Amino acid sequence: VTVLLMSAISLSSASQHSHAILPPPSSLQSIGFGSCLEGQKSLSILSTITAAKPDVFIFAGDNVYAENETLDPKLASLREAYQQLSEAPEFQAMSESVPILATWDDHDYGLNDAGQDFPQRQASEQLFESFWGVPAADPSRTRPGIYRVVRIGQAPQAIQIILLDTRFFRTSLSKPWIPPLTGRYTPSEDPLQSMLGESQWLWLQEILKE
């Protein structure tokens, strides 16, 4: 069994999107992945990906950038970023022919460097899962966070793609007393510091035993 872990160091209903996300194929020979897709810039890279015809493509985080990252409880700017991507011809053509999986990082989570202290994290999760077509029956829909596993093929040639969530449960970063001299953050000595959170760690341990 091959294991691929993906992490990065959906609108109110799917029917509002002008795209559909294809499910993963039954077998794989090629996997594409990328991140940091700034919608304000050229999206021609998506046409290149479409032409390459990967069996599945993984958006690994920062898949959209809200124009105004704020604590807006309605996530208006983030919703608009998703809508713009949905309407982009390059993305529409890609999503029509290439199966897509996704995880997020801070900008498509909703706020730069945000973690578990982001007040809109649950609403952002709903946006993400709707936009990227996470199946209603997927176990990730029944728990906090977007982490999930996707299994493709049959043993002994099965592939297990593990999509981790490094934002929803991440504890706050340590900020220095004098940022200009030491940078935005400093190493933490807190033994409770976490990136995945306890529940995701326990889940990952069990998944890796399979």
Locations of regions flagged by a protein language model:
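Metal-dependent phosphoester/phosphodiester hydrolase catalytic core
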Residues: 17-210
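Intrinsically disordered, low-complexity serine/threonine-rich segments
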Residues: 10-16
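Bacterial N-terminal signal peptides
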Residues: 1-10
